Amino acid sequence: MQSVKLGVGDKIMTQESSSWQQIVAKYQHPQRLKSIWQLVNTLIPYAILWFLMVQSLQVSYWLTFVLSIIAAGFLIRLFIIFHDCGHGSFFKSHKANFFWGYVTGVLTFTPYYYWWHSHAQHHACAGDLDHRGIGDVWTMTVEEYLKASRKTKIIYRVARNPFVLFVIAPAVLFLILHRLPTKEKGGRANKSIYFTNLGILGMAIIMSLIMGWKTYLMFQIPVVMMSASLGVWLFYVQHQFEGVYWERQEKWDYVTEALKGSSFFKLPKVLQWFTGNIGFHHIHHLSPRIPNYNLERCHNENPLFQNIKPITFFTSFKSLAFRLWDEQNQRLVGFDYLKQLKKS
């Protein structure tokens, strides 16, 4: 299969591109009523859960905690809507995508334009060993790790620790880093951060007037932290799994990356609903213009996708063992693999 490279960051199309493009084309059209219904069946239950959490404090904090877990699930679903708006796939209208992207960005504590810009780079570079570090999980090759300084090795081991990766890092990212403008992010991205911060401040003031600022923070911070942790876990499993595709830029192929470098995370139907079908990540990377509510149908209706081995809820936990990319053997390995290298 030969590839024609269009340049760094551009898609790489194969000779079979016309066939897969024809396959995905009919699923790329947003349907206004479906999008509106998705907003309704996500925003309204999320608001109701906030009301119930306030009322439940008079009964039991454990009941409040259970409700907050469900609320975190709805916040993940809101993030998927936010995500689709960023890809321009939720509505046909650019203005509608921008408006609802901003609104859901405030609710999910994520600046719309800044996130969209870095996420677009992720789509352009996912699975490319020469363009890591943009919108992805820090992953070193075995060779890079062995050549790294002791300090870098310690930092990397800490960064790849599951507690740091799925608890501390998501909280820092969504609660702190997404609030801070920098020169590196650029003017438009920083404006996005400023306006998102203003929106969050306005939301916090209104909610504090309704329920008190202590109660608001007692709900908001845990809900954001839980949804952020689960969201990062989803993202991790989508690109760090057994059999994943990584390649150097000169050999990197767009279609192969989508179908082999992005997982088919087959979740139970309830979890699939809360995560907005993002488990069909191979379809999403093949065509980010497909709305989340069309991803499953695209997968099920086309033979091209039927031989892709799914990752299940339970098998996904195998990904926790992966720490490094073994470039020589084209696979992810754990730190224990380094001990085997020393013995050999």
What are these model-predicted stretches?
Residues L49, G86, F90-F91, W246, ...:
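Active-site-flanking alpha-helical
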Residues T14-Q15, S93-K95, G133, Q272-F274:
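Short helix-capping and inter-helix turn/linker motifs at the boundaries of alpha-helical repeat units
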Residues M1-A72, V106-I221, Y293-S344:
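Non-catalytic, topology-defining segments of multipass membrane proteins
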Residues D253-L271:
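Cytosolic juxtamembrane regulatory segments of multi-pass membrane proteins
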Residues L78-H87, W115-G127, L234-G243, F274-I290:
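Histidine-centered catalytic micro-motifs
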Residues I81-F99, A124-T141:
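Aspartate-rich (DDxxD/NDxxD/DxxxD) Mg2+/diphosphate-binding motifs
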